[in-house]
């Protein structure tokens, strides 16, 4: 299995492991575990799309990046529709409505061709609002799983945390690349973006150890996490160079995708 699939492997493992506990814990026609995973993936996609657009605007020519942007847009819209269709509470529907409102603006920006610096700046300014709205939905769905279905009576507190943290880690790897590009692309705002980059760097670094020692790991996922830690060490041991933008953009893109 390729390293870039490791967090997906962890999510699949913990969701499968918990199936005997969660058959009656549903978010509409899907389980709460799957709903947390899907809504968590929306966070990652918001950053992945932003990153891809900025890379193209910066002049990185790679058809893979263009395909990544287009497929991420399609998946984001499809998953948002799934979450909307299965939402039953008024609060959840309100969170989804807010995401749609932001997404409509965001989608227009992502569709602005050819990719350019001016639109890239607008994407940077809006991406955190979309990310926060997606995260608010994750938190709401987690709360519903606890309140409506007594989820935590099955001693699955750690399981829900692992699903959320694994999804968040996928988002952070994309956000790392996004703000690395922004710090290089917008020299006047470099200090601001460098501060954000440092914050994301530290948050990503702090979570890897937790994922490594959680009780739902398999031997395979532990080995893959070890491989991720080896890749991450390149940036971890040269944090100042990373924050100062001394790595090639394509290298950062490839490495963060592998994380």
Question: Which role does the model predict for each range below?
Answer:
Residues 5-15:
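Sec-dependent N-terminal signal peptides
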Residues 1-2:
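N-terminal secretory signal peptides that target proteins for export/translocation
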Residues 22-184, 188-259:
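Hydrophobic alpha-helical segments
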């Amino acid at each position: 299995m390729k390293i870039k699939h490791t967090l997906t492997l962890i999510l699949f493992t913990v969701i499968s492991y918990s199936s005997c506990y969660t058959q009656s814990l549903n978010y509409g026609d899907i389980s709460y575990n799957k709903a947390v995973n899907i809504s968590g993936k929306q966070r990652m996609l918001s950053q992945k799309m932003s990153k891809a657009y900025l890379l193209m605007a910066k002049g990185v020519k790679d058809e893979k990046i263009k395909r990544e942007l287009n497929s991420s847009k399609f998946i984001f819209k499809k998953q948002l529709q799934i979450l909307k269709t299965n939402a039953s509470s008024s609060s959840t529907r309100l969170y989804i409505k807010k995401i749609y409102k932001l997404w409509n603006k965001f989608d227009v920006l992502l569709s602005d061709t050819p990719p350019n610096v001016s639109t890239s700046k607008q994407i940077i300014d809006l991406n955190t609002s979309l990310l926060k709205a997606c995260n608010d939905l994750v938190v709401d769905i987690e709360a519903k799983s606890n309140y409506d279905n007594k989820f935590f009576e099955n001693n699955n507190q750690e399981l829900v945390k692992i699903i959320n943290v694994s999804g968040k880690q996928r988002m952070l790897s994309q956000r790392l690349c996004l703000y690395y590009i922004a710090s290089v692309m917008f020299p006047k705002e470099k200090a601001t973006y460098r501060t954000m980059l440092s914050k994301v760097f530290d948050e990503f670094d702090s979570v890897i150890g937790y994922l490594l020692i959680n009780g739902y790991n398999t031997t395979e996922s532990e080995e893959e996490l070890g491989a991720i830690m080896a890749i991450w060490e390149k940036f971890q041991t040269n944090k100042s160079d990373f924050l100062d933008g001394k790595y090639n953009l394509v290298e950062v893109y490839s490495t963060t995708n592998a994380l």
